[in-house]
């Protein structure tokens, strides 16, 4: 498990392009037959992936996080971005098609990932956060999520937001997770942008051709920087940073938040004229 440390915004604005990428961009997440994870000290979130092929993959024990098993004091949200697969949580099997999700509650001792077709495997993206109580493990069908259609073609941001894990749906201790799908010919996300001082966020971009990318904007509103993000890469966004992007074509991204609360209304909009 790779470890990333937190950073003060005054340090961030002095970083080079390569330093920004090293600290905040998560590359090479998906490897066949492996589980990969990054632990960020920003709200102690773990971002990871699993690509099971011939054999199922078992989430490692909790030794790296000071626990007897991985979910001893954690919860986890999982979304499949690949072909059909399954997750087994303490013996209970959940079949997941592409874009289906799963919330697994604290105290689940064993978590396994598998693919129906090893030659065309499932690709599980997951985010885990600390937890203080056990909520029920629950499958999330994208067709049954709360969906909100926003934006317009004239603003190049027509999109649908699907809420997977949130207070009015599948409940959790602190994890909030969902997916945003941009319509064809639409390329902007989260603009006008905002901040949420009491929550961090991770954006994971996918469903892009290999030669496409998203110009992801981050930093304080008056000290913005950018990261070139390609298919199936993620960006860690501290609470002091905006998180917005524009792509060379339309794309999909999974967003996940953790922190002090789960309130969507607890944000600070950033006026467009203040961006620099």
UniProtKB/Swiss-Prot annotation:
Pathway annotation: Glycan metabolism; pectin degradation; 2-dehydro-3-deoxy-D-gluconate from pectin: step 4/5
Residues that bind Zn(2+): 194, 196, 201, 243
Highest taxon of the lineage: Bacteria
One biological process term in Gene Ontology: D-glucuronate catabolic process
Catalysed reaction, written as an equation: 5-dehydro-4-deoxy-D-glucuronate = 3-deoxy-D-glycero-2,5-hexodiulosonate
Spans through the membrane: none
Disulphide bonds in the chain: none
E.C. number(s) listed in UniProt: 5.3.1.17
Note accompanying the cofactor annotation: Binds 1 zinc ion per subunit.
One Pfam match: KduI
Keywords per UniProt: Isomerase, Metal-binding, Zinc
GO molecular function, one term: 4-deoxy-L-threo-5-hexosulose-uronate ketol-isomerase activity
HAMAP family: KduI
Known role: Catalyzes the isomerization of 5-dehydro-4-deoxy-D-glucuronate to 3-deoxy-D-glycero-2,5-hexodiulosonate.
Family of this protein: Belongs to the KduI family.
Name under which the protein is recorded: 4-deoxy-L-threo-5-hexosulose-uronate ketol-isomerase
Organism of this sequence: Caldicellulosiruptor bescii (strain ATCC BAA-1888 / DSM 6725 / KCTC 15123 / Z-1320) (Anaerocellum thermophilum)
Higher taxonomy: Bacteria, Bacillati, Bacillota, Bacillota incertae sedis, Caldicellulosiruptorales
